[in-house]
Structure formats: structure tokens, C-alpha cells
Amino acid sequence: MSDARRPDPTPAPSTPARPTVDEAAPVVNPHMYALVVAVTYLPVLLSGMKLDVRGTEHVPPPGTPLVIAANHVSGLDPFLVARALPRGRFLQFMAKKELFLPVIGWIIRTGGSFPVDRSGNDVASIRTALRVLKENGTVGIFPEGTRGGTELHGGVALIAAKGRAPILPAGIRRDGRRWIVTFGPPISPKGGIKAVTAELGTELARLSQAG
């Protein structure tokens, strides 16, 4: 038997580390963000409509974590809410992954938004949202999931509770030649997932139908 030393077996490749809350949040470029908000408002202007914003006194000042939950009625919703926010609040929406195509996906990412897989429990997107909140950012979510949805998902309350951030309800509706965005009083995330989700549903229904 040979005394030659056999080479050590090739080590198995290590499994990539799973993302943690300590990783960096998606970056918002303020100049590109402002450009995206301005450009995406053009369809509203060109159609002869205008944006009517109400309840801005309910929006907490910048520098604090915030979750904005809005009803979903059109493809313009994220941009209408972003434009309605006071200066200094950069809205980072959880957008469906199907939108992240080569061109429009770049635009969305430039604004700091990030994809979510609506087919199941997307743990990665939740962790990304928590990173944004940890850095005192603003996460935007459509709790109905799709346009015109009637059932709210509990993910908003879960993210707000884990991120220790209030939920700012935003009602969106169209009235003739106006898009109306109405912010309501912030909702505390401490009441339990079901209770907070129910309260949010009541507020969104009220704000989206307000006169």
C-alpha cells in the first residue's frame, strides 16, 4: 500500500447566505426619484385631469419609519401617492415582480421600489421592506394585492409590527376630472394582525369614498 498522501476532497460549495435585516436597503436617488414622479404625472396632465391631495397633516415628518397602505384602482396609483406626499418622503413601493421588465423595471428600481412575488409568501420582499423601515424609509403597499380587490392581506400589519412603524392609510378615487388622494390618521401596528388589518380596511373604505 502506498504511503502517498491522497489529495483532500474538493470542498462542497457553500450555500449563499440568506438576506438579513442588516443588509442595505434599496437606494433612492432623490434626483431620479423626482424625475420619475414628474414624468409619470404627465399622463394625468395630458388627459386634462388634476390631482387633489387631502389629509397631508396626517403624514409623519421625514426621518421616521412609515408604511403607507393604499387601495388599488389604477396603474397610476403608486405615482399619484408618491406625488401626493410632502417633500422629503420618498415612497418605496412593493411592486409586483411582473413589472420589472428591462426598461420599466429600471425606472421602478431607480425610484427605490422593489419586487414582490404575489404567488406566495415572499420572505425576501418582506426583509427588504424591513430594511427600508430600519433606515427610516417609507414603504408603500397595496393590501388588496390587485386592482379592485376586496380582501385585505395581513402582510401590511405584519411588516408594520416588525418594523415598528405606523400605517398611514391612503384612499385613492377618481371624481370626474380629478384624482383624489386622501391620507387618514396613522394606525398603530400594536393591536394584533387581524385587528389592525380590520381597522385598516375600514379606514381605506372610508377614505376612498369620502366626499
Predicted regions and their residues:
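Short acidic-hydrophobic, aromatic-tinged amphipathic segments that line or gate anion-handling sites
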Residues: 53-54, 114-117, 188-189
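Non-catalytic C-terminal accessory region of glycerolipid acyltransferases
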Residues: 2-31, 64, 123-211
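A generic structural signal for well-ordered alpha-helical segments
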Residues: 44, 86, 107-108, 132, ...
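Helix-to-loop junction immediately C-terminal to a conserved catalytic motif
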Residues: 32-35, 40-72
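Catalytic core of membrane glycerolipid acyltransferases/transacylases, capturing the structured
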Residues: 60-120
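Glycine-rich, highly charged phosphate/nucleotide-binding loops
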Residues: 49-54, 119-126
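Short, glycine/polar-rich helix-capping loops at beta-to-alpha or helix-loop-helix junctions
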Residues: 36, 100-104, 176-178
